[in-house]
UniProtKB/Swiss-Prot annotation:
Family: Belongs to the RecX family.
NCBIfam families: PRK00117.1-1
Main location group: cytoplasm
Annotated keywords: Cytoplasm
Annotated protein name in UniProt: Regulatory protein RecX
């Protein structure tokens, strides 16, 4: 058995695993690398794949070539998904950074997305605290803290009351 034939099963297992992972949802390249490097849980506990670094690179390249792995598509879908769940731009940026997406790619996608963050912040505040929003200082501070935790920028939060007064 030659070395190239002995590496073939490891590459095939890695490729199969990558396609299965990417079939569930989009992943960033760094996420996919981390998941591929993790041991597989078998019947007798964790099993290591005896794949080389070259096998990992070939699998990642194959996924890019065939459209299974695309960081720009992942970023756009991630921003849309997290904003629908009520998270603001600061939190989304932080989560994308944790997933290995570059700051430039994140900023580009944030500029291209058509999301009104102020309206989204207002929707989150009214969903949690009711309509009309409280004007008492102590209640405004609670709402502000809640929205900051959700990742909204201070200027968007202040615009809620500025627009509310108009």
């Amino acid at each position: 058995m030659t070395e190239s034939t002995s590496l073939r099963p490891a590459y095939a297992r890695l490729l199969d695993r990558a396609v299965r992972i990417l079939a569930v949802r989009d992943h960033s390249e760094q996420e996919l690398r981390r998941k591929l490097a993790a041991p597989i849980m078998g019947k007798n506990g964790p099993e290591e794949i005896d794949a080389t670094a070259e096998d990992y690179e070939r699998v990642i390249a194959w996924c890019h070539e065939h459209g299974y792995l695309d960081d720009s598509r992942f970023v756009a879908r991630f921003i849309a998904s997290r904003s629908r769940k009520g998270y603001g731009p600061a939190r989304i940026r932080q989560e994308l950074n944790q997933k290995g997406i570059s700051r430039e790619a994140t900023e580009k996608a944030m500029r291209e997305c058509d999301i009104d963050w102020c309206a989204l912040a207002r929707d989150q505040a009214t969903r949690k605290y009711g309509e009309p929003l409280p004007t008492v200082f102590s209640e405004k501070v609670k709402i502000q803290r809640f929205l900051l935790y959700r990742g909204y920028l201070m200027e968007d939060i202040q615009d809620i009351w500025r627009n509310f007064a108009d």
